Amino acid sequence: RGRVAVMGTTSTFSEQSRAGAGRPDFPGRPGVNALRHDLVHHVERGFFDSLQQGMEALGYKDIQDARKAFGFRGLEEAKPDITEIEFLENKFLLGEEFGVSTSANQDDLDGMAKWIRGATKQADWVVYGAHCHESGNTGEFHGITRISPPEFLIEAAHWAIDQGADLFAGHGPHFLRGIEIYNNRPIFYSLGNFIFQNESVLWMPDEAYRRFNLGYDQTPGDYLDTRSGGGTRAFAADPVF
């Protein structure tokens, strides 16, 4: 018998959904406790040179320079174009081979740490959850997500345990991922679906219907049946879900 603290974060969110800090002269913005991450695409020389050429030919380099000169990019350091390019809001880094890497945002990790350490003083056990649809670079696909967890989620899970969490529980991709015992404490990278009510939604927005050329006479049941191809694709057809 004891007290359990349950806390959580999400790495899958729209930017406007993220909670924002307040100031003495401005209230904080309510929102989700976000776990941001840095995504880097490592590319070989030929691809990198083509990106540079495309940036200039399409005018994106001029737009970036104008934004920096106008001050809209804040005090960010100038990136060396000889090794790093930001193209269509994606970061590309010159390397020896192609690859993708991710790392957790340190400010968000520090925020996690503060509240985990506080919870350990008020509870007997601390459970930390993370909603994460992103995936790693290996393993088979189920839907648009791979079996492997992303690097930044592994980093965050280890960090949470190091700060005092007794258990880290991931969810989001709708299927089971691996389990790790880290410092004698369990990490579940995805618990899958204990209860999945994807097909029991009562209302759908108009654009959802229009995506499948459905009109005003159709119901949510019609939409869901059309989306799943009559149960032949997506969640309904893959037993892993």
Which residues make up each language-model segment?
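Acidic, metal/ion-coordinating pockets
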Residues: 1-241
